[in-house]
Amino acid sequence: MFKVDLNSDLGESFGAYKMGMDEEILKFVSSVNVACGFHAGDPCVMDETLNLAKQNGVCIGAHPSYPDLLGFGRRNMQISFEEAKNYALYQLGALFGFAKAKGMKIQHFKAHGALYNMAAIDENLALALCEAVASFDENIIFLGLSNSAMNEAAKKKGLRYANEVFADRAYNDDGTLVSRKLEGALIHDENLAIKRVIKMIKESKVTSINGKEIDLKADSICVHGDNAKALEFVKKIKENLKKEQIQICALENFI
């Protein structure tokens, strides 16, 4: 039987600003990526997010970013190897404090936004992130874009790697994600998106925005719970995976 993880970004509210439908999305996913304060999230939000994850039996992961609250971590920054490593360690430590206090463990590490996209093509940046994870806890799974520089970096640092794919994003011919700034970056046809997800899991292939067949591996599918429509889409994905006899489970069960 095929196995796959469903992951979603959570804990992205900040102070008086609320973002996402965290409580609702937790009913459908097996892993969550918790914002660690650099792009979103704050101590109280992190505390509440972990409480919700624990109540729902969902595994948690660190979701670190460039230090970019105003830009929600979606703006690129030129930083050194040491800076990247230290930013990652700092944010891992923040999540670890709450996790330890609640008797929870960090299952995985997934970079956010521009940091994720850059680490997918910049092996030096990817190595800095992997070195941070390996020095913090070598049992943490590194979750990153399938067939990217992060995969190679994780191998070099002796980390387990989970290949991530996206249900609603278009791919370039080289396997990277089409920039959100470009037309066609997001797939709005839910039925098409679900067919693509099943193909990625069962055939390890996806069709690029230019019609090219790309090889990739799908260990985890990133889904979103920003609004009611997004939640319904996640529900449809889960229902269709079950119909296809694809088991949904957290990464720690098969990576």
Curated annotation (Swiss-Prot):
Protein EC: 3.5.2.9
Chemical reaction(s) catalysed: 5-oxo-L-proline + ATP + 2 H2O = L-glutamate + ADP + phosphate + H(+)
Gene Ontology annotations of biological process type: carbohydrate metabolic process
Class in the EC hierarchy, top level: hydrolase
GO molecular function: 5-oxoprolinase (ATP-hydrolyzing) activity; ATP binding
InterPro entries according to UniProt: Glyco_hydro/deAcase_b/a-brl, LamB/YcsF/PxpA-like
Keyword Hydrolase belongs to the record: yes
Entry keyword set: ATP-binding, Hydrolase, Nucleotide-binding
Similarity comment: Belongs to the LamB/PxpA family.
PANTHER family, sorted: 5-OXOPROLINASE SUBUNIT A, UNCHARACTERIZED PROTEIN YBGL-RELATED
Record function comment: Catalyzes the cleavage of 5-oxoproline to form L-glutamate coupled to the hydrolysis of ATP to ADP and inorganic phosphate.
Subunit and interaction comment: Forms a complex composed of PxpA, PxpB and PxpC.
UniProt name for this protein: 5-oxoprolinase subunit A
Species, as recorded: Campylobacter jejuni subsp. jejuni serotype O:2 (strain ATCC 700819 / NCTC 11168)
Gene: pxpA
